[in-house]
Curated annotation (Swiss-Prot):
This is Glycine--tRNA ligase beta subunit. GO terms for biological process: arginyl-tRNA aminoacylation; glycyl-tRNA aminoacylation. The lineage of its organism: Bacteria, Pseudomonadati, Pseudomonadota, Gammaproteobacteria, Enterobacterales. GO terms for cellular component: cytosol. It catalyses: tRNA(Gly) + glycine + ATP = glycyl-tRNA(Gly) + AMP + diphosphate. Tetramer of two alpha and two beta subunits.
Amino acid sequence: MSEKTFLVEIGTEELPPKALRSLAESFAANFTAELDNAGLAHGTVQWFAAPRRLALKVANLAEAQPDREIEKRGPAIAQAFDAEGKPSKAAEGWARGCGITVDQAERLTTDKGEWLLYRAYVKGESTEALLPNMVATSLAKLPIPKLMRWGASDVHFVRPVHTVTLLLGDKVIPATILGIQSDRVIRGHRFMGEPEFTIDNADQYPEILRERGKVIADYEERKAKIKADAEEAARKIGGNADLSESLLEEVASLVEWPVVLTAKFEEKFLAVPSEALVYTMKGDQKYFPVYANDGKLLPNFIFVANIESKDPQQIISGNEKVVRPRLADAEFFFNTDRKKRLEDNLPRLQTVLFQQQLGTLRDKTDRIQALAGWIAEQIGADVNHATRAGLLSKCDLMTNMVFEFTDTQGVMGMHYARHDGEAEDVAVALNEQYQPRFAGDDLPSNPVACALAIADKMDTLAGIFGIGQHPKGDKDPFALRRAALGVLRIIVEKNLNLDLQTLTEEAVRLYGDKLTNASVVDDVIDFMLGRFRAWYQDEGYSVDTIQAVLARRPTRPADFDARMKAVSHFRTLEEASALAAANKRVSNILAKATEPLNDIVHASVLKEAAEIELARHLVVLRDKLQPYFADGRYQEALIELAALRAPVDEFFENVMVNAEEKDIRINRLTLLSKLRELFLQVADISLLQ
């Protein structure tokens, strides 16, 4: 069967830059699934994405589905014919459904009996006939949160569509996709190359688009070119470009023909905190800041044009003129804000609502101040500095700089606090109170910052849960999932001695009578333990290991982490699977027991050698392991408990638990309950698979 290259390109108006990659990758994944479901043999499915196009190129696509044999089993012979050998109604109905008579059916004989059988050969459908619907289906499944309509048609897509190219080898596949008749016409760059041209063969893509249309369709190639050219441009001026992955992705999604240029701004603006300047350059203008080798910001920036200009200096000057007023604004705000102390903004917090039922930002500040001090006392941080940081924590939200450049919240608080002469750990805490902001983000660097960050997040969790506004589905307007995980990460990774029970109770207490949810403490803790589940799954822990620890509901995050590591290590031991199975068996036996058990195992009632030996081991281990459990040395404890495998196996092989004599039966059940209690000091091992 011959093979050809298939090309589909959807030419559009400018696609959303932050969604471009996901659209292209989803298009490729959807179409690959369509090919595989149809049984069409194919080679690599390569995706292309540029601001005004999505495309796929499929190598070595078979021209048709393979012919295949189908078999359809009918009734057993005993049910297919009556005593006189005439076909039954069941047999005739089956044959009619297959398009044959009963006489035309074959016989299938196996060691289990004999059946009627229909066998047929189906010719594979041509690829050309299948492709239009496969493309349409793949596009319809794209993750587009908001669709557009254009013109008078009822067609919906992420952006208006102007061209659809469908080529199998050199042949156009006739189809109407998204309201556009397929053709071999492709549009080039808006301002360079040929605005429109035809492509003769799918193999010419994407090279023909680069040569004639001045468009680099390969997303990764554009991104790599921007990165390499920006690094070289920064090197030429003695610096290093800030090429964050997210901004690289966005810029690569904005240009079809990237041209990297270097511009500058007045050195006087360097007196403004670099974070504000960088916010303007990266956030507003999509520029790459440049830093010297010592980490200081240089008065330069790198940007990417979408055109090769005969006069690049004109483009450079234009971008410098655009950014200058924004930097001047930042300079003005910085100088104006410093004319008063950060603390002077406290009264204005009373005018800003945190949440209608929970009060203003000033109310939140008072709670954070108290909670940060309480946490500092628990973890051995400077209580005075923690309460001071709590008092100032939201003051920068009232400054001109943060009002205009919202992403500078926290960091500007740090700069203004330093200007006011606040303690350094207080200033740093104001910056780090929102950390970690995302997965993998840095944690607060000092104990005061940890206390403030936890206090801020716990106040939000307690308040929002306290009025019954739990996150539902994808809706989490107060970012409670991120807040919960942030608290857990700080406590675990900084090894802080904090208990979620007392921490949540204190956060709730500070709200007074504002909260209406009576179960708020349990709700918050359950929610946070649920975040633990997601965290440890991301870390590669098995679901049943997590379940085994969650079953004990440990509320000290550092303790939870120690149990997780202990159970994970326990699973590597040779004895683990047998002991997990034994724990499961014990759990089932105890669940069925209806008689009250003894407080202790009575040695005088023990009869069999195996139960006497198991009881002896339990007494020895109980005394030995108490310090292990008290110190959280769970891994060592489970290693010791692994020695129970042999006596437990002997017990179940040689001892009848449910003996007829009541005293013996209850004593043996008590023995098993003591065995289970030892393991439950760490986790519910019976849940391990």
